[in-house]
Amino acid sequence: MEDRPNTPKSEGFYRNKKIDPLLHKKYFLKYRTIKKIGEGSFGKVYKAEYNNEYFAIKFEDKESDQHLLETEVSIMNYLKGPYIPQIKAFGYNQNYFMLVMDLMGKNLEQLLIKTKDKKFSIKTTSLLAYQMISILKYIHNKHIIHRDIKPDNFVVGLNHQNGQLFLIDFGLAKKYRSSKTLEQLPYIKKKKLTGTARYASIHALEEMEQSRRDDLEAVGYVLFYFLNGNLPWMGMKIKSKEDRIKKILDKKKGTSIKELCKNLPYEFREFLEYTRNLEYTEEPKYDIFKNNFYNLITNKYQEKFDYIYDWTTENELKKRKKKYINNLNDNNDENHYEKEEESIKNIEIKINLNMKEVKGNDLTNSLSHIKVGSNIINTINIKENKKIMDNDDIINNKVYLKCCIM
C-alpha cells in the first residue's frame, strides 16, 4: 500500500471560524487522507475527509526546487469568486506545505480520455469555450494571468456545481499589470518558458513576457485538442526539454490555422486567429467570442445552452432537475426560468451581482491558523490582501501566513 502524507494522531491544528463556520464544531480539527487524486512537479493532491465532508489537500515537498504553494494561496484568496475553489486551510509540518480546499470533480483531461473517441463534441467544446473565456475575463480583470492553461487545470464542480467549470493551479500565475495605474509589465525576453509547451502560446515558447493574449491563445489550442483528440506537435521524438520546446515552437509556427481548423466550425478558427494577432497590451474582446460560441450552439446547431456535456449522466440530470424545481419554488417567480437559454446566458451576470468584493483583511481573516497544543507557530507578517495585490512583485515577494502543523 502506498505511503501517503497524513495528520499525526496526536497533532492537528486550529482554524479561524471565519473560514467555514459549519466545520468549526470543534476547536481541534483533523483531516484524514483517503486516496491520491493528482500529482505533478509541485507535489501530490489527496482526497481527505473530516466530519463526513470531503476536501482536497495539496502537499508540496519542502525540499522541492520551487515553492509555489504560498503564491497559489495568496492569489486564490485574492481571486475568490464563482470560478475559483475555496481555500479551507493552509499550513505545514516538518516535510510539507499543505493547502486544504474544496474537493472538485474530474479535470477535463480525465473526462476527455474516457470518451469513446477521446474527443469532445462541438456542443461540449463550445460550452467549455464559453466558460473558459468567462473565467479568464474574470481573473484578467483582477490583474492576474494564469500562464499554465491546459485541460488538467480546468475541473468540473461536484454535486450542485456539476455543470460549472473551475480553474485551479495558480502556482505559476502572476500580476501582469499594476492594479493602481493599470500599466503592464515590460515586454521583455525571459530566461525560460513558463507553462506547458503543448498549449503555450508562440510568444511564451519564445520565452517572452506573457499577458492576457497568451492565456487566450492557449485556450485556442486546448479547444482544438478537444475537437481533434490530438495536436500536430504531439508525439514528436524529443531528445531533451530544450529540444522539445524548439520543435513544438517550430511546428506551431509552421502549421497554418486553416490547416489546424480543417473541417471545424469557423468560430474556432476565428478565435485562434484573433488571439494570435492581439497586441501585448491589448484588451481582448471576451464577450464577442463568448457570444460566438453561444450562437454556435443555439443558432447554428439548434441545441440548448444547458451545460449538458458529453460526460453528463442520467443521474446528474435528475439531480439538476430537482435543484431546478427547488429554485423555482424558492424564487416563487413563474417567469424567472421561462426560457432556459436566457437563464443560462445570464448566469454570469447574476453571479457577478452577488459577488462580494475582496476586502483588505480577507487574507488575514481567512488564513490565520494558529496553534499546535498551546504554541503559536511561525507567525510572520501577514500582509493585508490589498497590500499584496498592489505589490507588482507578488511572485518574488513570498507571502508568509500564520500556519500550523498538521
Question: What does each model-found stretch correspond to?
Answer:
Residues S74-P82:
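Structural motif at the C-terminus of the N-lobe alphaC helix and the adjacent alphaC-beta4 loop
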Residues E49-E70:
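ATP-binding glycine-rich loop module of kinase domains
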